[in-house]
Amino acid sequence: VKILLISKHSKYEWERKQLSLTHDELVSKYNKERANLDAIMEAHEKQLHVRTTFKRVFTDSKFCMMHELSDTITDYDMVMVLGGDNAFTYVSHYIKNIPVLGINSDPDRSTGHLLKWSATDDQSIFDLAEVIDFHHYGISKWTRLEATIDGKVISPATSEYFFGERMRKNMSRHILVYRDKEYEQKCSGILFTTGAGSTGWAHSSSNIPPWDPSDKYAGFVVTEPYMSECNGGELLPGEELTLYSLNDSEGYASSDSWEEFEFMRGSEAKIYIGSPLNIMIPKRV
């Protein structure tokens, strides 16, 4: 079995890299910001330990950091992602048909709604190796969203798309075409969410009840609407929802809060159910 093992950076690693700071400089910054230095360093050590243990147990796998990805992943039988939900959705943008397993690398600090295994200790990693060796897992097909803006395909969304103004203080405006009816809306933006994303942003903004990631439909919610006749609904397979932008400041769309696309006045977006994401569901040993 050819496995690609992908890991997130710890907060400490990422900020040293991005800010080009020495250890002492970053610690000084954390102290100035009243950050919990002990918790940050404990999480860093946990990430390093889990990463090292996975490399030692899965000796034949190829390893990379998530931000080293640049093209669609091919030539592997499965992908394993070490991190949290954000790392999982990031990597999912590079996956088409290959089964993927999200692994919570720090379950004490991360909920990991989208992750189907947890690295609670070293034994849990050995157990996962046994699960894979004996094929004790199934595949669940999670619904994903796809979209075009002005005819150009954008990245799929595992959790959600957002369309609106970049700045919260600016009103988002668009025309929503849903099931042959048009609605001109003023709001704080519109969210299109899958079952995988239904426990996150859309739930927090509108308290919608979550649904299973494998359910073959998506939902949408208009956030903070002003006198709107249509504040939400379902999107079924074969349906297509159209959005015409009336944003005149910094209108944009985002996919899983990772990738961004311009969505200014006059732009047209079409949103629909796309190809599913194949999720590995281990059977506990």
Language-model segments: residues:
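A short, gly/pro- and small-residue-rich
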Residues: S92-D106
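Catalytic phosphate-donor-binding core of small-molecule kinases
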Residues: I3-H9, W14, H23-L26, M41-L69, ...
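N-terminal glycine-rich "phosphate-gripper" loop used for MgATP/nucleotide binding
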Residues: V81-D85
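Structural motif
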Residues: D77-M78
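Conserved binding/recognition cores within well-folded domains
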Residues: T193-A196
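Short, well-ordered alpha-helical microsegments
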Residues: A87-T89
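Short amphipathic alpha-helical segments
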Residues: K17-Q18, V91-Y94, H203-S206
